[in-house]
């Protein structure tokens, strides 16, 4: 509840070409009784983020605390103004990276009252994705339906282009979403009339209709951009295919190690007289009938590369059977 009466000051004069409204607020010391400390870095990051999300808006951040004043007593001040909006945001995040394509892919459209704005750029020296999602200027750190829609349309669209351009055969398996998003920096901002957030912290968007809207609008704009920029789609697909091949090679290596570990650690048949050589190319396995034959075979074998396995029952001649 407010304490004290509202105080107004002279407002800007429209005749002098000044417009706008000034709103001031201070935390209630009766509620925040432990202490009030404003963290400059936190506030600066959030205001810069808002300036990126609302291109053309000028935000002035002034720290009037005594500790922040310069030698002449002037407060520390920063101005955030980004006419390019989230396109400049992506450029800012990629300034230390090697962009795969100089032009940032930009989407700005609206459907069923939902506004969708997205900026995307792949980098050759990055091997993971960096996707920032926002809903009504709120950072959705846990993702949500808008991020799901973006990931889905990226995977579908680029796989379609890969088949269309002959980069992948029809019989080949599709590129995984992680392969396609490798090196991607993206900012996705949606404006939803009636947002539904999961949890009190509003970190995940839950509107189911947003998934399809993002899929539709981003897919249309992305396909159009790639159609007119064949060199860009070629570079993106080349990186995605390299990521796919690397993932497949890593998977095969893991399976080989696991299979080898299983063979080395698993219990061998009790009556098997194994050989010492571990290379299957150089080894032989003799299957004999009964323990008596097994004993005779063990006496005459070369332990280095010959293994003996006695079994019960008569061996079937499979070729004749």
For the regions a protein language model found, what residue spans apply to each?
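GHKL-family ATPase ATP-binding module
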Residues: 1-321
């Amino acid at each position: 509840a407010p304490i004290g009466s509202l105080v107004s000051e002279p407002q800007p004069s429209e005749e002098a070409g000044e417009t706008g409204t000034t709103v001031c607020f201070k935390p209630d010391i009766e509620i925040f009784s432990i202490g009030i400390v404003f963290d400059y870095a936190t506030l600066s990051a959030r205001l810069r983020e808002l300036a990126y999300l609302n291109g053309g808006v000028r935000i002035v951040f002034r720290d009037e605390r005594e500790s922040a004043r310069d030698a002449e007593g002037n407060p520390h001040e920063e101005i955030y103004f980004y006419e390019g909006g989230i396109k400049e945001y992506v450029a800012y995040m990629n300034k230390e990276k090697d962009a795969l394509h100089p032009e940032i892919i930009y989407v700005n459209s609206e459907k069923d009252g939902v506004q969708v704005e997205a900026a995307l750029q792949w980098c050759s020296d990055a091997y993971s994705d960096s996707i920032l999602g926002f809903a009504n200027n709120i950072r959705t750190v846990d993702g949500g339906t808008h991020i799901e829609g973006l990931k889905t349309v990226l995977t579908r669209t680029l796989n379609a282009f890969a088949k269309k351009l002959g980069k992948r055969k029809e019989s080949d398996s599709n590129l995984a979403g992680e392969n396609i998003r490798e090196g991607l920096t993206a900012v996705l901002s949606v404006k939803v009339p009636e947002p539904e957030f999961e949890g009190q912290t509003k970190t995940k968007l839950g509107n189911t209709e947003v998934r399809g809207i993002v899929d539709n609008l981003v897919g249309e704009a992305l396909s159009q951009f790639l159609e007119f920029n064949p060199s860009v789609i070629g570079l993106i697909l080349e990186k995605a295919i390299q990521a796919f091949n690397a993932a497949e090679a890593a998977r095969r290596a893991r399976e080989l190690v696991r299979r080898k570990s299983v063979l080395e650690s698993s219990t061998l048949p009790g009556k098997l007289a194994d050989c010492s050589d571990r290379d299957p190319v150089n080894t032989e396995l003799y299957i004999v009938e009964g323990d008596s034959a097994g004993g005779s075979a063990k006496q005459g074998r070369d332990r280095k590369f010959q293994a003996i396995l006695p079994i019960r029952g008569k061996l079937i001649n499979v070729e004749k059977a």
